[in-house]
């Protein structure tokens, strides 16, 4: 990420994360607040800065600290006043490890709400938030602790090398803000499903929100728990499940009231609802697409909106695919270089917070230009925001800083994605990774 982009992000972080907030959260978590170089406020920012930089290392973050890049976040301890901040990464590394996970979690929850308020999108009655629910998987470094917590994938050829983490995130359809993620092991005896993680995620969004899910979440348990939590749902169903719901074949477009009743297969041993549980709603069947790409779309919804609006709302589901791509590639969540489960969870939370900071700048830029924040490039915006860091820090006074911030926001507003006149004529595809080295086999003990 460029320096100007970093400046804008730092300025926004300073505004939404004042030192008083961290002192309050630390006292609430029972931590003793010490006046040292690596305060919780500074450490969380340095971890975010690492996530947003292509070559983000501990050494690079400490170098930026010594050069004065993070001066607004430094406490006035003795070593800071004497300008005696060492280049060794040991102090920063220990500060990251000693950072309480509860404090990071509370900070993420608080800052997400503050960013939403900064966008001018507070929770309002009559205007429900619309979220897209989706899941993915992440890889982490091999270590005994991580392998025990998150077992590797396994097939007839043996086990994979890296532990795998399953993650589920709710993304705001309009702003692109990600809520706090939920995760668990993808394999092994304690493996958790995306649906179970999704039920945890929907518990922590305001009642009355609308949850959009693809066919993976088009099952009874997701609809039932969303109803119990006071949420509206729009979930896609498989053709088999749709036919079962209406009790017969579906020969054409339809919009029919249905009563989704639980079956003996739903939940199996993990069932947490009564045997006669049901969810009232509507089944909408429509053909979508063009020419030979036409296909049937089956949606179950508890909303009272017209069928055309329901289909259009579900059409926004694709946005989470680009959001997850930004999280895994630009914010570098695809593979986490950590050695402990505790550190993995903190890095995951901080990465989502860094992503939300960039999304906030993009939303503010779109507001100023009167455009759609979804038409801006996340990677371009991220680079511009980091490039503006020295400019804002060099500004004298709050007024000049605000002017520099506005100039960067205006620049971000120009990072528009290209408008294609027609769809690409070739099928989308990627080359497989292949095997660079022979598969390692375990020697059998005699």
What are these regions (language model features)?
Residues 64, 91-94, 110:
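Generic beta-strand or strand-like secondary-structure segments
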